Amino acid sequence: MESSDRSYVVIITARDEARYLQGTIDSIAGQTLLPVEMVIVNDGSRDETGAIADAAAEKHAWIHVVHRDDRGERKVGGGVVETFYAGYEALRTRDFAYQCKLDGDLTLPPGYFEGIIRKMEADPALGGASGKVFNPVGDGAVKEERIIDDMVSGAVNFWRRACWDQIGGYVRMVMWDGIAMHRARMFGWRTRSFRDKDLEIIHHRLMGSSHKNILHGRMRWGRGQWFMGCHPLYILASGVNRMF
């Protein structure tokens, strides 16, 4: 790919996201730089997620939909990756320079993807990137989903394709996003989440709260950190940091 190639694709993974999916689609359709293709994977939703996705595909030629059977419950970790790959394998184009795995409950600023690609163009070693993610907390206020600057938000995983191909994609297990970033750094790539105001993302549902409850999600996060071999003191410090 030429360094000036700004083509990118988006894979949205969505299960029971009828409340937020239309807003996510609208924020992508309003981007200053549109994706060459977007696949929405309806992961066995029991609400109107599938119908919303189908309507978007009828309206926009660059969107199409994959419907998966209902497995009976939301499957986190490896299930998210399986859903992503159902969309990735359904891509009609293979000619793109960047790719993004996106949750179905986000609002992106209009210059988001163009801004992230500019960051990539400015730093050829930057393999994965995102803006910072914020949760609404009422009365127009937001609270940041804290991650260190060297990590990329799992809700909006944007990759340079050359990096993605080298790391071999996502593993089908919990902490798939963190493992991908660690592998990227092992190969000499950089990963980063940027604090630029025009790259701020609104995540309408707190990360980890979509399956059962927030406590269960935080316990799952801790198990994932342990799985990756993080020191218990690091896990404790990181957990305390997320409380504030």
Predicted regions, residues:
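N-proximal low-complexity "stem/linker" segments adjacent to membrane-targeting elements
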Residues: M1-G30
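Cell-envelope/extracellular polymer assembly enzymes that use nucleotide-activated donors
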Residues: R6-V9, E37, I179
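Acidic donor-binding segment of Leloir-type glycosyltransferases
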Residues: D26-G72
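Active-site nucleotide-sugar/metal-binding loop of Leloir-type enzymes
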Residues: V81-Y98
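Short beta-strand-to-loop acidic/aromatic patch adjacent to the donor-nucleotide binding site
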Residues: D95-T107
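Conserved donor NDP-sugar-binding/catalytic core segment of glycosyltransferases
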Residues: T107-K143
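Conserved nucleotide-sugar donor-binding
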Residues: S153-G168
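Catalytic donor/gating beta->alpha subdomain of glycosyltransferases that bind UDP-sugars
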Residues: Y170-S238
